[in-house]
Amino acid sequence: MARRRVNTTKLEIIQTATRMFLENGYSATSIKAIANALDMSTGHLTFYFPTKEYLLAELVEMLCDFQWTQVRQYVDEGESLLMAICLELTAMAAICEENEVAKDFYLAAYTHPMTLEIIRKNDAQRAKLVFGEYCADWTQTQYTEAEILISGIEYATMMTTRESAPIDVRITGALNNIMLIYQVPEKIRKNKIRRVLDMEYTAIGRQMLVEFIAYIEETNEQAFEALLRRK
């Protein structure tokens, strides 16, 4: 019973933090502001999440699974998982380009060591599934090292400035280099890039963000406990 109460409280904190992070911005939202929104003392909140980065880490864990599930639904039936990989980064970059709050959230996830480690570990496991046919003799260490490079490419693609190239140029360069690291043949690289740029990737990015917020808000106690057991 006590454990259930703990998980219920953690879920309430996560739901409130998600809403505030994606409405006001991750950087602009303090632990104190989250605690106030929950009518909870800061000390009580930090009992569950010692810092804001711990909260972000919980969200990133949930986002990695959710976003991968969602992005596969946007590619044509029978399409390879490689296309889903290409669309995921493209949609993330597109939403970051038009939504500063979303950009702040995604860049924070790629900046803090705790969350960056989650992203790299998750993506390395996924890469074995997606790129295994091109890297049949690779070890786990090689996938891990590749994702260190790739996470930097992904961050640079989303982190735009006034001097940044247009999104289609950035996506072309990023996806080509990512697939090149994983030894994908040039013909396939060009085909996937062309096809993903023909998609409504900005609208898809918007929809994925909306659906993630709804997913967090609608997650019940039982579903949250199941997520915790998978970690």
Language model segments and positions:
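Solvent-exposed, amphipathic alpha-helical segments
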Residues: 16-24, 70, 74, 95, ...
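Hydrophobic alpha-helical connector segments
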Residues: 58, 69-102, 120-125
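C-terminal peripheral helix-coil segments that are non-catalytic and often amphipathic
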Residues: 128-132, 136, 163-231
